[in-house]
Amino acid sequence: MEIGHVYEMPPMRPDDAHTTYFPAGVIKIGVEFRDLTPEALVEYYGGDEDYVEELRRTAPLGIEDRGVSLHVFDADGHWEYLRFDLFEDAPHYHYNHLGGGRNHIIPFDETAHGPIADWAVAKIRSGELAPMLAQAGGAELAARLDPKALATAADDVAAHAADLQARLAASA
């Protein structure tokens, strides 16, 4: 059974000018603040109003939200395999399947799992990131994850994400 929603278009890449990257061995993790709006999606996807309308129609929790995103790339930054969106209204995560535009978005249940920020950092810190990477087509990376590098990166990612979230809360 597949949960969530699959879009056949690639996800929005992070804005490198506003993303801080933390190396973690064979992967790197980007931390970015995002303000997701229909207008931002239209601008990113070249004015494809049909795609934005599909998002409005099919996204169960809407597409206007903001918060911190954690981007999990291969170390060279060629492919974003996973993304954890620590959003205010509709936290969720993505499997961005290697080699295509398949973008699988899964709503996050904070009642069952606690705050998504804690859950996402725990996934990065632990071996539980490996099956998620494999699911997104990164089995080779998953097999080569370095637990020490992940632990160090997880601490840095958690601190930077908390700082961005605090700034977000202060601006509300």
Task: Locate predicted features.
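An exposed acidic His-Trp-rich patch
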Residues: 79-139
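Charge-rich, low-complexity N-terminal segments
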Residues: 1-60
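Short, flexible loop/turn elements at secondary-structure junctions
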Residues: 33-35, 74, 88
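Generic structural hydrophobic/aromatic packing signal, biased to beta-strands
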Residues: 22, 29-33, 70, 84, ...
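Generic hydrophobic, helix-prone segments enriched in Leu/Val/Ile
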Residues: 29-31, 120-124, 157, 164
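Conserved aromatic-histidine-acidic binding/catalytic patches
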Residues: 58-62, 112, 145
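Short, well-structured hydrophobic secondary-structure segments
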Residues: 59-83
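C-terminal charged interaction modules
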Residues: 129-172
